[in-house]
UniProtKB/Swiss-Prot annotation:
Binding site for 2-oxoglutarate: R169
Official protein name in the record: PKHD-type hydroxylase Ajs_0512
GO molecular function per UniProt: 2-oxoglutarate-dependent dioxygenase activity; iron ion binding; L-ascorbic acid binding
SS bond partners: none
Residues covered by the Fe2OG dioxygenase domain: 78-178
Protein's GO biological process: DNA damage response; intracellular iron ion homeostasis
Organism: Acidovorax sp. (strain JS42)
Classification via InterPro entries: Oxoglu/Fe-dep_dioxygenase_dom (IPR005123), PKHD_C (IPR041097), PKHD_hydroxylase (IPR023550), Pro_4_hyd_alph (IPR006620), Pro_4_hyd_alph_FE2OG_OXY (IPR044862)
Length: 227
């Protein structure tokens, strides 16, 4: 399941982010890549753990906590602190799958990566190339969203970023461990929740159909969740 979420950040917030990121020091992204990914990764990143990275990342997390579509789709248990990258001058990231387990920064606690997220911080017309290509059961989906919009996709997906031939592609990226690890179960819960949300304004709060569907949702979540 690949889901686009509009306006996680407003245009004003994006401009503020970019003013700070464009003035920041960037490092070679290959330094943080795994052994296999290092050979196909050509981008820049903001230093992990820097004050800027932490401050902007916390702002993103606050926005996500009040974004119902994100909560419904991800059912987040743990979110890896957002990171920031930049692709320019032919920068690219070849086909790869994200690591299944990651240590949370500054701790010995591991998290499982169920979902990957990219929050775009550059408008599509600012750069050529730079599409996020995600392979799924129905082929390859190319994603290039407006600044402030975000895409969620399974971390198990083979994916790549195509070469940026003009301008710069700036984004935040991070991973989510879901309360419901199984992608199929999580998708069913998302579809059911969205149907409930669409039905809610059309019927009375005590409508038996709405009450029953809501009960089914929570009982399935109770069965499948791993808190």
């Amino acid at each position: 399941m690949l889901i686009s979420i509009d306006q996680v950040l407003s245009k004003t917030e994006v401009r503020d982010f970019r003013a700070q990121l464009d003035a920041a020091a960037w490092e070679d992204g290959a330094a943080t890549a795994g052994t296999l990914a290092k050979s196909v990764k050509r981008n820049q990143q903001i230093t992990d753990g820097s004050e800027l990275c932490q401050r902007l990342g916390q702002h993103i997390l606050r926005r996500l906590s009040s974004t119902p579509l994100f909560i419904s789709a991800a059912l987040p248990r743990t979110i890896y602190p957002p990171k920031f990258n930049r692709y320019a001058d032919g920068g690219t990231y070849g086909a790869h799958v994200d690591s299944a387990l990651m240590f949370l920064p500054g701790s010995h606690q591991q998290m499982r990566t169920d979902l990957s997220a990219t929050l775009f911080l550059a408008e599509p017309e600012e750069y050529d190339g730079g599409e996020l290509e995600v392979e799924g059961p129905f082929g390859v989906q190319a994603v290039k969203l407006a600044a402030g919009d975000m895409v969620l996709y399974p971390s198990s997906s083979l994916h790549r970023v195509t070469p940026v031939t003009r301008g710069a592609r700036v984004a935040s990226f991070f991973w989510i461990e879901s309360l419901v690890p199984d992608e199929g179960e999580r998708t069913l819960l998302f579809d059911l929740d969205q149907s409930i949300q669409q039905l809610t304004p059309l019927v009375a709060p005590d409508d038996p159909r709405l009450v029953q569907l809501t009960g089914v949702y929570h009982n399935l979540l109770r069965r499948w969740a791993r808190p």
